[in-house]
Amino acid sequence: EMLRSLVGSEMCIRDRPFSIAGVSKKKSLGRETGFKDKTQGTLFFDVADIISRHRPKAFFLENVKNLMSHDKGNTFKVIKGTLEELRYSLHYLVMDGQSYVPQHRERIMIVGFDCDIFHGEEQFVFPEQKQKTKSIKDILDPNIEEKYTLSDKLWNYLQNYAEKHRAKGNGFGFGLVSLDGISRTLSARYYKDGSEILIPQSDGKNPRRLSPRECARLMGYPDEYRLNQVSDVQAYRQCGNSVVVPLITAVSEQLIKTMLAN
């Protein structure tokens, strides 16, 4: 049975840059090159291989914004060329999760349609990027365990660290958020000290980190989503490596709408 659609995330630009040296050599010898030559040894090779073998009618890939500038733009050039070589028409856009959750999280969305089916005539449109509708205070629990409050030692360290880099003209430091604003991007390393997103507290208490449940809300997961079967460390990692659920849902709905219209 034909694979109707393929959805994937994190093709991982932490892979080594795609090499074009071998491709150039083959071309100089008059030999054919293909996506396997350009992407061999990268995670994207697996994605391209699945698409090549199963020919889904459409696919939807998500990755970090820096994919477009990685390796001076060569990485995205190879990815785009590879997908077009496989005869897919592409639509791509950098979108910010803050349209759906109180978090600044820019990601590139890549949607492709099989040219043999849609002939490049699909009327796909990305969902409108709305103004932020939620603030950090909307995801916070009123009663939070004391273990999420920073110790005096850690709080002093973070302040001294930030001051040291501020004196050098660097921008490194903790992220003490405004309750009426949005947060920085949640990363998988949040479990280490929580410094990228700190919540101010009253009564002279040190700031606190988000709980795993609050992190899940920051990614758009409903409270019915279970987190109690893993440790806090693993929950933080999973949330930091995840996607903004309502954003992915909105793009997916547009993809399905386009497929049904053709």
Per-range role (PLM):
Residues 1-9, 13:
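Single conserved hydrophobic/aromatic residue that forms the stacking wall/gate
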Residues 9, 18-19:
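Conserved SGNH/GDSL esterase-like catalytic core that processes O-acyl groups on lipids
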Residues 13-15, 22, 190, 222:
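Short, small-residue-rich loop/turn micro-motifs
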Residues 14, 56, 102, 222, ...:
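Proline-centered helix-kink/hinge sites
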Residues 14, 24, 114, 242-244:
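Gly/Ser/Thr-rich beta-alpha loop segments that engage phosphate groups in nucleotides
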Residues 19-185, 189:
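Class I S-adenosyl-L-methionine
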Residues 150-262:
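C-terminal target-recognition/interaction regions appended to catalytic cores
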